[in-house]
Amino acid sequence: FILPYSVDMLMTAILAVFFQALSTSKYMGWGLMVVYLVASITLVSLGFEHPLYNFGDVGFVMVSDLNGADVGGEKSWWLRLYWGGICAILSVIAYLLWRRGVAVSLRAQLARVPARLVGAPALIALIGLGVSTTTGGWMFYQMNVVNEYVISDEQEEQLADYEKQFLQYENVKQPSTTHVQLDVDLYPHAGRALFKGSYTLINDTGAPVEELHVLFQDGYSDLTELDIPGGTLTLDEQEDYGYQIYALEPAMAPGETLEMRFAAERIHNGFSTRGEDTRLVKNGTFLNNA
């Protein structure tokens, strides 16, 4: 705990010093820091949630006795490196703008910056720029290209659309599961798990079942194979909503059983902004068939 929190507090302290360097008085510097604290909370609630533009955001880290800081720990240190580069630049700017002797206006201080930006300050600023640009670009690729960046409002909108589209099927009678067979290959250090299995279903509704509704909503796993004897895919919203409908030909008679086979995979790709997978970890993996 000590090292990561010390780094986080140091970055906040550097930002506070930077605000003081921009201000004509210490009270104005305090005021700017208060504005930053309020804005950081307000902007997140307005949808500005990306850790690459929320100062000092290092993501979520779950610490446990079994798994240490494996969940989110690597991403948090990459983000600290990114923000560390930016803090190096802020430190140089604060040093160059710091008032020495007779007080002068901020405009006059800014005018002197190019002449002062030589030697060690220039080198530190250049290194900070290189570190923040390189790590920031790589993290953006991991979070926005390899993974999908979705803000909370979009997730809520997607949930509302799901309810509007599929609420009509709420009371559709479906067969019950009587037996589950599941084979799992775990590769915890690679962040990967492969699943193969089957569900034995029985039509206990008292009436023929003409359609089978399949719901697979796991943001960390992909359904790679689904075999339903006599089933024809008539609705496929798997990518957006995890919902599929299969027409059964012939219809499933009362008391009849059916074996549905499937395969799926769970893979950790890059870094995600939507939260960490706390189920598949290096030590202490916990999975269920829900």
Q: How should each PLM-predicted stretch be described?
A:
Residues 3-290:
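Acidic/His-enriched low-complexity segments
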